[in-house]
Amino acid sequence: RSVDATPNQIRVEAGSRDYYRVSASGVVGSGIALSAQTSQYGGYQDASGYDQQKATLRIDQEWGGWQVDGALEGSQLDQETAGYIRGYEAYEDDQARKENPNPEAYRNAWSGRGHIGLTRDWGDSSELTIRPFWRSNSMTFLQHYLPWQATETNRHHSLGVQMSARGTQNALSWLVGIDADHTEGGLVENQADFFSPNQPDGIHYDYDVDADTVAAFTHLDWSLTDRWQIGAGVRLEDTRYDYANNASDGAVCAPTASACRFYRPADRKDSFSDWTGNLSINHHTDATTVYGQVARGFRAPQTTELYRLQAGQMAADIDSEEAESVEFGIRGAGNTLSYDLSVYWTTKENVIFQDRDRFNVSGAETTHRGVELAASWRISPTWALSGNASYARHRYNSDIQLLGSRDSIDGNDIDTAPKHFGSLQLTADFARYNVPISGELEWVWLS
């Protein structure tokens, strides 16, 4: 939200289960805005809930021919988390839903980030933008979902810069840029009490990782006619990890342990080079747009997938996940009705997973097909109805030895991916009657 769009207001909210939130915002100087909020929630389970604070300082100014916009943000979270309820169809029991098997569970986290963008004209129809940024966060929580209940602390601190130039020449719009990011992170997992020879007390993991990422990208939009438009883009990215183990290498357990759960790999370096791309075509009329797009994406392995190993795995030989997708759709807008309907098909390759030996490996394939709809209807100047819905099938497309499976899962649905979900909102705004009251009734479903 820009400085000009920041309202001068104080807002107080209250809800069920001891939910309260107080927020304030306003312009505090020329091109400077400040907003802050504090909230608390009692939770619907016993001994659960959170306290959270957030603050944002934003600037929008002009300095020496440069248009400057930036923000400094911070947040703090103290949460009493809750364990999973137990029992067959326990979620249907009103009393069981409120129980908390792990009242000792908690999560404490803080984060901060800042960025400042410098933009100026470059030539007759181009502009240059330089945006340095900083981010920092840390989180400590109890792994209450595991019987041995270790405590984990993870953190990372980053500095980077995004540089881009964009312009327009006749029917062609173009964008080129470079991103660079240096991150220093780490993780410590410590177990206070002895559980078994295979899950001993003490330090399980203690490591630092320096990550450097450099990327170059470009994107073009070409208006063939007033109604036809083609877009294309590509991004090349290189990520390098420098991992340092701060504890002893190898298994955490004593040599007599039958199946040690934790393994600390030796210091190592890893690198991943990947590319993404997209090609789209759009046809516009006065009221509708028909569009199609093909795209390729990737995800480099996470540091925990590479260095937080188990069951004697000495090294994780994994590569980046890849995804290819095709999408077609139609969107339109009229005086009272707007909609966006799309269908998509996606395949993912080199999917990273834990096999039956608890090794982190890659090579799985999945397919994802679905249809999505978003629509809104302005019933009257006061009342509006909006909603979205999705139907999708997510399936394994390879015969992998997934952790917890015994037989072939090729063709099986991915049980953690819902088939149907959506929401419906009925809103009312009485501002036209000079009454500063608005309300919303929402229905959400997931299956």
Give each language-model segment a name.
Residues 82-100, 142-149, 190-204, 241-270, ...:
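Solvent-exposed loop segments that connect transmembrane elements
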Residues 41, 48, 67-115, 137-156, ...:
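Flexible loop and strand-edge segments within Gram-negative outer membrane beta-barrel domains
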Residues 223-230, 238, 338, 343-348, ...:
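Gram-negative outer-membrane beta-barrel transporters
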Residues 14-18, 38-42, 63, 74-78, ...:
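Transmembrane beta-strands of outer-membrane beta-barrel pores
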Residues 23-30, 127-143, 282-297, 307, ...:
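Membrane-embedded beta-barrel scaffold of Gram-negative outer-membrane proteins
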Residues 170-181, 207-346, 378-380, 427:
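Structural signature of Gram-negative outer-membrane beta-barrels, strongest in the C-terminal barrel
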Residues 16-40, 45-82, 104-127, 168, ...:
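Transmembrane beta-barrel wall of Gram-negative outer-membrane proteins
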Residues 30-34, 65-68, 125-128, 171-174, ...:
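Repeated loop/turn-to-beta-strand initiation elements of outer-membrane beta-barrel proteins
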